[in-house]
Amino acid sequence: MAIERTFSIIKPNAVAKNVIGSIFARFEAAGFKIVGTKMLHLTVEQARGFYAEHDGKPFFDGLVEFMTSGPILVSVLESENAVQRHRDLLGATNPANALAGTLRADYADSLTENGTHGSDSLESAQREIAFFFGEGEVCPRTR
């Protein structure tokens, strides 16, 4: 199976809970290599651009407000079948439906404040990585 890259966000509520290290430890324990990461505070324009596919939906303004409410940590993860394995680790988008032991079951506060984001396809991962990371900011792990 080929090595894939996926995109991950630790959202403002999880950053505020000071669980970044715990989440990274779980990524690594699951076999992911962290090949790019940065902390930033999204502007309204960045949040609206990143979530543009949801523009016009009832939850869009609340999502933008939440995602600009504090710092986030964006990361690129690498492993075999990375997109699906990462989504499995995150758990259901709605934390009420997330299985015990998933990140959302452990760190989410609500459907909007669900602690984490993960790409839903390889195409989304490529687009989302390019949104936040420029040339040379992702370092492949070869060991």
From Swiss-Prot:
Indicate which residues the UniProt annotation says bind ATP: 11, 59, 87, 93, 104, 114
Taking the first listed entry, what is the main subcellular location of this protein, grouped into a coarse class?
cytoplasm
Q: Where in the cell is it found?
A: Cytoplasm
Protein keywords: ATP-binding, Cytoplasm, Kinase, Magnesium, Metal-binding, Nucleotide metabolism, Nucleotide-binding, Phosphoprotein, Transferase
Self-association state and partner proteins as the record states: Homotetramer.
Protein family (similarity comment): Belongs to the NDK family.
What is the name attached to this protein's record? Answer: Nucleoside diphosphate kinase
